[in-house]
């Protein structure tokens, strides 16, 4: 078989590429996650499960092949039906059905997995669990709380239930040998990423989520500290006071020292609220306080390969980022966030620009805006304008902000959207076949000096579902090279004018072919 095309991108030189077919990866790579690959775990230590953090392969170990789908793979069930069921052949792992059947997470029935909404902490179903939580936190009902993070998410039943209540949750779980949790969540159409609370900050900015949830996550909080010491506003933690009263009391004391107020508790749900009053932090700034205040050497918003530290970052008082100062959902989507009040004009222009662009996209891709497209990624956004323009569609959007560009991810969360830091010179923290649509706007123009186009496009192919779409908006310098490599990945692409019909950039609307491995 011919060797894959090699493209060296130069910002001022048009790459010349001939279409060459990429080979298929071996079938045992059908769920390959390059930066969280269990095959490479033995190279890293077990301290605080650091081997489950991101460890990307060097360039000489990168795969230059197409990841095959499982034998019998079908197009995913469409939303909202997918919230309750998925095709077994798309995620053919029986272990969770066999090992967790008594917890009612999911069950296999014929050719499908069904999701009844159960779990270890949901004996009466996740709906009753969230009803109790809403009784404890009334702000979950009125649009005050819009974004949440769920650590150790299982099959994301909590996040799925919250979608019906207007709350958008990022479900987080590590890659494990069972190859299940995040993959099931995304197959259901629920936002999720691979990740673990270990030695590195999560890839989010400070003061981003409105609420954090952890259900039986089995973390010794009083030894390492809760996961919300630098970003979250609400925190729900499941406690068994009768069995662990001493640990619970220690946790309360630790959170008090971090300026969290014990807010409410009922049954096995305990809730703390993060203070928005900096007077508390002033009282803790004495030399012998624990945890101590952080110095100014590390940006609190930095979240890409930043080591966790045992210290507190004081929220910026002038910005008033507490929930009581934020507009309620959905108003907050269109209000200029306080983080960029000096750039209000630019924010409004960005919002108008993306409304025009998305209208044009829909004329070229009629599936955009209907149930065929559920899981969407905007690969290099600024303020989340593309996602905001799709807010009334059945889709949710993972907004990606470059770890090497303008740090605007906090603005995206202030709007009530979700996103993540990422560097596209590396693989994304997700399983193969997890997104229906990938959108990029000038990514290769921005990153041509760092990232090899071939590897970026192969990563796009890995995470795009068969028969999924890509909208690629790029400079004419790169558009033909992208089209040539896409042909070698078995994509069908068509070139179009932009909404302005300008010649300096073009659109590629691509669709990935559904194919099966010859070895299966």
Map each language-model feature to its residues.
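Conserved class I S-adenosyl-L-methionine
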Residues: 142-160, 170, 370-391, 398
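A short glycine-rich, Lys/Arg-flanked "PGG" loop and its adjoining helix->strand segment in the class I
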Residues: 205, 210, 224-232, 433, ...
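Intrinsically disordered, low-complexity glycine/charged-rich regulatory or linker segments
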Residues: 1-144, 236-240, 248-375, 382, ...
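A short SAM/SAH-binding and catalytic strip from SAM-dependent methyltransferases
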Residues: 198-200, 209-225, 435-451, 470
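S-adenosyl-L-methionine
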Residues: 182-206, 410-432
